[in-house]
């Protein structure tokens, strides 16, 4: 496998820490050891997160193309767009963000706090669009790209989650290589890796990276899209493309893509009772915060799988904490009493 042939622009602090979740593990019976790899602490750029790791492989291409404007898309409380805005500010580039109405959640301050507030503070041109949730290529985003061209700019396209970008899976191939180095350092080996999946390139990159040591199907995706067929197709397609890019040396099969669909409801962006219980439990036992859109759902999935005995006794499970906490203020009514 050859990830090193791709240029990488450093936007993160370096390897992200792995934290034992001792109190949560004990609370759930102590038969499974839970750990978190803190991608939410990976950068000094506006709280970082998993997209910042991905952007390290997109930015060299943007610079080579002499782009002057990063153009991306997400929901109103998109972590992706906040991270793109931060990187643009860091590099002295312009930024155009299309923010679609992906979540059926009505709150008078939803489009004025959290991620979108931070993007505006960093100088991004934020464009609110009423279109609903979809993980594919969006017309509103293509129109934004064209508008930059018409104004004389040189736009660089960054699709939702970086996922449909040809290089979007590379960052989390690097994640797997980083985990292997940390396993060697700490003298342990993780039996499972739990990760939230929506647009797919995070899990796709992990599948390719862990396929190198036989653990592709030990990457357990927790769907948060509530459109799992689309998400599974996108994960599989991106993983196969990424495997070719890095010369993995074997095909990615359908069996390599594990996506648990039990925890996404009621729909994208809206928590269920299990989501909220997991958010509060992790916060109160570990001081680790998760959000109702993504990480709360993957935390719910991991906790429930432990309770159901779906991880063998003695298993070591690594939870990939991808970020998302800046969106919590947009859901303040839900957590008014904690």
From Swiss-Prot:
Pfam family, one: PALP
Catalytic activity: 1-aminocyclopropane-1-carboxylate + H2O = 2-oxobutanoate + NH4(+)
Cofactor(s) listed: pyridoxal 5'-phosphate
Residues forming the catalytic site: 78 (nucleophile)
Keyword Mitochondrion: no
Xref: InterPro entries: ACCD_DCysDesulf, ACP_carboxylate_deaminase, ACP_carboxylate_deaminase_bac, TrpB-like_PALP, TrpB-like_PALP_sf
Domain of life: Bacteria
EC class name: hydrolase
UniProt cross-references to CDD domains, sorted A to Z: ACCD
Keywords: Hydrolase, Pyridoxal phosphate
Molecular function per GO: 1-aminocyclopropane-1-carboxylate deaminase activity; D-cysteine desulfhydrase activity; pyridoxal phosphate binding
Primary role: Catalyzes a cyclopropane ring-opening reaction, the irreversible conversion of 1-aminocyclopropane-1-carboxylate (ACC) to ammonia and alpha-ketobutyrate. Allows growth on ACC as a nitrogen source.
Assembly and oligomerization: Homotrimer.
Family the entry assigns: Belongs to the ACC deaminase/D-cysteine desulfhydrase family.
Protein name, per record: 1-aminocyclopropane-1-carboxylate deaminase
Organism the protein comes from: Burkholderia multivorans (strain ATCC 17616 / 249)
Lineage: Bacteria, Pseudomonadati, Pseudomonadota, Betaproteobacteria, Burkholderiales
């Amino acid at each position: 496998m050859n990830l090193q042939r791709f240029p990488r622009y450093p936007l993160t602090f370096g390897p992200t820490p792995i934290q034992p979740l001792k109190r949560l593990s004990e609370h759930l019976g102590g038969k499974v050891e839970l750990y978190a790899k803190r991608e939410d602490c990976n950068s000094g750029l506006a709280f970082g997160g998993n997209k910042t790791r991905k952007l390290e492989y997109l930015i060299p291409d943007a610079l080579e193309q002499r782009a002057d404007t990063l153009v991306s898309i997400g929901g109103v409380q998109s972590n992706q767009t906040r991270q793109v805005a931060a990187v643009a500010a860091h590099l002295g580039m312009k930024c155009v963000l299309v923010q679609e109405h992906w979540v059926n959640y009505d709150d008078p301050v939803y489009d004025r706090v959290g991620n979108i507030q931070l993007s505006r503070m960093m100088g991004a041109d934020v464009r609110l669009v009423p279109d609903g949730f979809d993980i594919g290529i969006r017309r509103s985003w293509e129109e934004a790209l064209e508008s930059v061209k018409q104004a004389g700019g040189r736009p660089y396209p960054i699709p939702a989650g970086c996922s449909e970008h040809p290089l979007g899976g590379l960052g989390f191939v690097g994640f797997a290589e980083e985990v292997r180095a940390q396993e060697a350092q700490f003298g342990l080996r993780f039996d499972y890796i739990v990760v939230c999946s929506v647009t797919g390139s995070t899990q796709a990159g992990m599948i390719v990276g862990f396929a190198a040591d036989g653990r592709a199907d030990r990457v357990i995706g927790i769907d948060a899209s509530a459109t799992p067929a689309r998400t599974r197709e996108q994960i599989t397609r991106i993983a196969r493309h990424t495997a070719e890019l890095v010369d993995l040396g074997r095909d990615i099969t359908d069996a390599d893509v594990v996506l648990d669909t039990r925890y996404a409801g009621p729909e994208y962006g809206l928590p269920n009772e299990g989501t909220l219980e997991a958010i509060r439990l992790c916060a109160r036992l570990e001081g680790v915060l998760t959000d109702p859109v993504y990480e709360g759902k993957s935390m719910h999935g991991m906790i429930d799988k432990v309770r159901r005995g779906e991880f063998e006794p003695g298993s070591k499970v690594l939870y990939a904490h991808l970020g998302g906490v800046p969106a919590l203020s947009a859901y303040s009514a839900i957590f008014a009493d904690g």
